[in-house]
Every structure is written in C-alpha cells, then in structure tokens.
Amino acid sequence: MTLYPAIDLKDGKAVRLTKGLMDSAKIYSDEPWMLVKKFEEMGAKWVHLVDLNGAFAGEPKNLEQIIKIRQNCKVKLELGGGIRDEDTIKKMLEIGIDRVILGSIAVKNPTFVKEMAAKYPIAVGIDAIDGFVAVEGWGEVSAMRATDLAKEFANAGVEAIICTDVSRDGTLSGVNVEFTLDIANACKIPTIASGGVKDESDIEALVSAKGIDGVIIGKAYYEGTLDLPKMFKKYS
C-alpha cells in the first residue's frame, strides 16, 4: 500500500478543501515545499499535488511553487489540475514532475489520454459524485459512470487510476472502500483511493480489501487524526 500525502495548491499556498468547494479552502502552509520536505523526511515515496487554480482555469497556475518543490525535494511527485494538452504534459515532466494526472480531459477526450499514456507517465483521476464522474474542478457532473470510465483505460498503459469520492473529500468521514474496489475491479489498473480518510482504520480497510494499491492522505494528517510517520513505518 503506497501512501500519498496530498497538497492542494491555491494562490501559492498549501490548502485543503471540503467536498471540492473552493471557498472552503483552509490554509495549512505558506511554503508548500517545506511541507513536501517534511513528508519526504517521514518516509514518503510519493507526494500528490493538485493545482486548484489550474483545475478551474484549465492550465497550471502555481508553477512557481511546483518548481520550488521540485528544486528542494527528491520525493516522487504526481501533479493534477488543469493539464489538458500535450505541451503542458511535456512542460510538467520537464520541470521534474514524475507523473501527470489527467482528469476532466479523460471524460471529454479519452482517445487523447490513451495517446498520452502510450508516451508519458500518466495517471487518470476519476472524481465521482454518487457514482457519476465529476469534471471541471468538480463543478459539473457528467452522465458517465465512474466504473465505465475506468474500463475505457483498461489496456491503455495508464500507470494508475486515482478515484475520489467527492462527497467524502476533506470530510474525515471515512474512505469509500466499495467504490474504490469497484473501480479497481473494472479496469485492473493500479488504483489509488482518495476522499474521506480519517484514521488508521481506513488504511486497514483498504489493505484488507485486497486489490487497492494506494491511498491519498490529506486532511487526516493536517488535522491530526492520522499518525502519518507511524503509517509509513507500518505500510510502506
């Protein structure tokens, strides 16, 4: 089980949202790179970054902070938020991002995502509300089922599927194991759970489910409901 500490970038700061609502942003650090360094020192192999401004603007907006993180930290980085064309993918990889997350574009242009997955290290972010895919920074809900979207990429060379239950994201209400397992079983691609993680019992439930490869940890760390250094020692 790979643990992915998460940092959402908004206006150059590290924040967390509740249920994806921008006006719910709570600032946890004015220097995101220092947080990433802290995760690295705890034992993180990966850190999950989301450019929130980018998700809404359709292009990365926190480049200065992303570059600063890369310059100061050796941990592997995956980045999502507003990455919707090949030039942006190449630019992110050139500045040292290890894996690019494609979200909204996966619904609107799955062929493009498959082409990119054949050339670059790509993860697909599937964010869902009541089982249906949410797009455009979670501002819209599509008519596509999350499991159907996952199946679309079954043999495309995608490195990972990151599935988020939007209704639980940032709520500390517990991870949706069943939803994550449905996605994992639908596509047979390494699947990472996201949304609602509160404490060690959530990590244990994901490990016990067998078939889920990773978990994104955000507010549970920031609010102190999960002992992250202990989790790295136990599960990494």
UniProtKB/Swiss-Prot annotation:
One of its GO terms (biological process) is L-histidine biosynthetic process. Pathway: Amino-acid biosynthesis; L-histidine biosynthesis; L-histidine from 5-phospho-alpha-D-ribose 1-diphosphate: step 4/9. Keywords: Amino-acid biosynthesis, Cytoplasm, Histidine biosynthesis, Isomerase. Belongs to the HisA/HisF family. It comes from the Bacteria. It catalyses: 1-(5-phospho-beta-D-ribosyl)-5-[(5-phospho-beta-D-ribosylamino)methylideneamino]imidazole-4-carboxamide = 5-[(5-phospho-1-deoxy-D-ribulos-1-ylimino)methylamino]-1-(5-phospho-beta-D-ribosyl)imidazole-4-carboxamide. This is 1-(5-phosphoribosyl)-5-[(5-phosphoribosylamino)methylideneamino] imidazole-4-carboxamide isomerase. Its EC number is 5.3.1.16. The keyword Transferase does not apply. Its main location: cytoplasm. It is found in: Cytoplasm. It holds the Pfam family His_biosynth. The active site is at D8 (proton acceptor), D127 (proton donor). GO terms for molecular function: 1-(5-phosphoribosyl)-5-[(5-phosphoribosylamino)methylideneamino]imidazole-4-carboxamide isomerase activity. InterPro entries: Aldolase_TIM, His_biosynth, HisA_bact_arch, Isoase_HisA-like, Isoase_HisA-like_bact, RibuloseP-bd_barrel. GO terms for cellular component: cytoplasm.
